[in-house]
A protein has these predicted regions:
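N-terminal glutamine amidotransferase
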Residues: 2, 26-29
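A short, charged/proline- and glycine-enriched loop
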Residues: 4-6, 61-62
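Extreme N-terminal starter segment of soluble prokaryotic enzymes
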Residues: 5-10, 36
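Pre-active-site segment of Zn-dependent metallo-hydrolases
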Residues: 15, 28-68, 72-88, 93, ...
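Short beta-strand scaffold segments in enzyme catalytic cores
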Residues: 20-26
């Protein structure tokens, strides 16, 4: 019979640090279709966070869906970077989180912009990406 009637998920945690939650799930269905679902896309907050936050280890345009667990910046802080780099799909979360995310990302952008300026670095994303 082989694997043709099997459903399986490959889970790739794309971080080794405590913050920066970002888990890519590749779901393979019995009919052969594949969906890529990203669970969270958070900011790293470790000492070398500016460097850690600059890149995503996957192509955002290849992600089918994003699911956000809650609005803490270490779970949502790189969503604007995801959008800036090509993600155009929907972001799924609870109603309460969807309201709070807007405020969290606006505040986060101000902090990121200021820290980038102090470090003489380019900001990760622009205000329009928020």
């Amino acid at each position: 019979m082989g694997n043709k009637n099997r459903f399986y998920v490959d889970v790739m945690a794309v971080h080794k640090e405590v913050t920066g939650s970002c888990i890519l799930n590749v779901i393979k269905f019995p009919d052969g279709t594949t969906k890529k679902v990203l669970i969270d896309c958070g900011l790293f907050q470790e000492p070398n966070y500016l460097e850690l936050n600059k890149t995503l280890p996957f192509k955002p345009e290849n992600i089918d869906y994003v699911i956000v667990t809650h609005n803490h910046v270490d779970h949502v802080g790189r969503l604007p970077l995801l959008v800036k780099n090509g993600y155009r799909g929907k972001i799924y979360t609870s109603m309460d989180t969807s309201i709070l995310i807007r405020h969290a990302l606006a505040d986060s952008y101000k902090v990121i912009r200021q820290k980038a300026k102090l470090a003489n670095e380019k900001c990760l994303y622009s205000e329009k990406d928020v």
